[in-house]
């Protein structure tokens, strides 16, 4: 089965073609960072309009480059969660193409796409495992027994980790998008100059909270400004270092705790924040001490992309799940509400990815 995947949940327009026998044939991604940079964040109306402008040309390009014109067996598109206008663009285009081609279509859960992205790698993890989904909109720990068989272990009670990164960047007037900027500044930071708390790590449970850390960061910036004027680059770097260490340590502590509570020996991390090199480094160190292993997707598949949607959609379509022609999208959609499918249906994604 050859599946066209469409991702349009927020500010990236992604398309890909995945073949159940040959693997990932190709993917293309258009980022709207330049569109939203002057506003310091995503403007939903602008995001929707830009998806309309870019999606069909991207589909044309990917069908041509993968020699898939007339060869698509199904269309998978992101149905949620996300920005409703952006979701509707991808849903309408995906369903229209499926109808015109006479092939099935299916709406894919955006976070299931992220969760399964590490399976696109040459050495994918085996079920069962614990997943840390960490992005601008989500911070969740999930016990994964099979595709679709998910149990929520813990989640953020307020801000997501990625959102906290972005807000911290704004406080220091760093460029948009903020998360990567904080990570870059943190590399030059002096350890120990500022000490930040590790929220909710001193109590049992697997939930997160980052709103207090965000407030702590704001107070640190303001206190320094009152005493010494606006922070210079080195002070910003020192604050970024302390902030990033606090977030990373919190995530690592909870991940290790989740593995110990479930008895799992495998962790996957997915979502935009999973690209953070410091998080990867500290997770590998911590898990090695307990005989566990961490997997993640390559950096290009950590952010939103069409490849993860094509792959996730392919698994569900092979299992016989399709959608009707009604255009349903879900800005809010609990991951654990998805139906499980048999892992024996899962196709091998490895064959062509490393040749892209």
From Swiss-Prot:
GO biological process terms held by the UniProt record: tRNA threonylcarbamoyladenosine modification
Coiled coil: none
Alphabetized UniProt keyword annotations: Acyltransferase, Cytoplasm, Iron, Metal-binding, Transferase, tRNA processing
Record-level GO cellular component terms: cytoplasm
Sites where the protein binds substrate: 133-137, 166, 179, 276
Cofactor note: Binds 1 Fe(2+) ion per subunit.
SUPFAM superfamilies: Actin-like ATPase domain
The EC number(s) this enzyme carries: 2.3.1.234
Binding site for Fe cation: 110, 114, 304
Cysteine disulfide links: none
Enzyme class: transferase
Pfam families for the chain: TsaD
Family (UniProt): Belongs to the KAE1 / TsaD family.
Function: Required for the formation of a threonylcarbamoyl group on adenosine at position 37 (t(6)A37) in tRNAs that read codons beginning with adenine. Is involved in the transfer of the threonylcarbamoyl moiety of threonylcarbamoyl-AMP (TC-AMP) to the N6 group of A37, together with TsaE and TsaB. TsaD likely plays a direct catalytic role in this reaction.
Record's protein name: tRNA N6-adenosine threonylcarbamoyltransferase
Record gene name: tsaD
């Amino acid at each position: 089965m050859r599946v066209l995947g469409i991702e349009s949940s927020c500010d990236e327009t992604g398309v890909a073609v995945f073949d159940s026998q040959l693997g990932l044939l190709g993917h293309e991604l258009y980022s709207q960072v330049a569109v939203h940079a002057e506003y310091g964040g995503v403007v939903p109306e602008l995001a929707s309009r830009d998806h309309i402008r870019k999606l069909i040309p991207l589909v044309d390009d990917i069908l041509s480059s993968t020699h898939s014109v007339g060869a698509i067996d199904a269309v998978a598109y992101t149905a949620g969660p996300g920005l409703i206008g952006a979701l509707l663009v991808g849903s309408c285009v995906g369903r229209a193409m499926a109808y015109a081609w006479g092939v099935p279509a299916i709406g894919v859960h955006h976070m299931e796409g992220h969760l399964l992205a590490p399976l696109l790698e040459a050495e994918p993890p085996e079920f069962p495992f614990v997943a840390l989904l960490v992005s601008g909109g989500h911070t969740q720990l999930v016990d994964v027994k099979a595709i679709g068989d998910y149990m929520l272990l813990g989640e953020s009670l307020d801000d997501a980790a990625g959102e906290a990164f972005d807000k911290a960047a704004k406080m220091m007037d760093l460029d948009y998008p903020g998360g990567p900027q904080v990570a870059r500044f943190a590399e030059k930071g002096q350890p120990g100059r500022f000490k930040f708390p590790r929220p909710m790590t001193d109590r049992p449970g697997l939930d997160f909270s980052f709103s207090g850390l965000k407030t702590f960061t704001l107070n640190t910036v303001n206190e320094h400004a009152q005493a010494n004027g606006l922070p210079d680059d080195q002070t910003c770097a020192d604050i970024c270092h302390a902030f990033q260490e606090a977030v990373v340590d919190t995530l690592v502590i909870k991940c290790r705790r989740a593995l110990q509570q479930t008895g799992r020996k495998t962790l996957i991390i997915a979502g935009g924040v999973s690209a953070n090199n410091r998080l990867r480094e500290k997770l590998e160190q911590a898990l090695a001490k307990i005989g566990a292993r961490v997997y993640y997707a390559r950096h290009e598949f950590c952010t939103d992309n069409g490849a993860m949607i094509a792959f996730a959609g392919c698994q569900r379509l092979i299992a016989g799940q399709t959608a009707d022609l009604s255009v349903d999208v879900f800005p809010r959609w609990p991951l654990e509400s998805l139906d499980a499918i048999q892992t024996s249906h899962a196709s091998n994604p490895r064959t062509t990815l490393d040749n892209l």
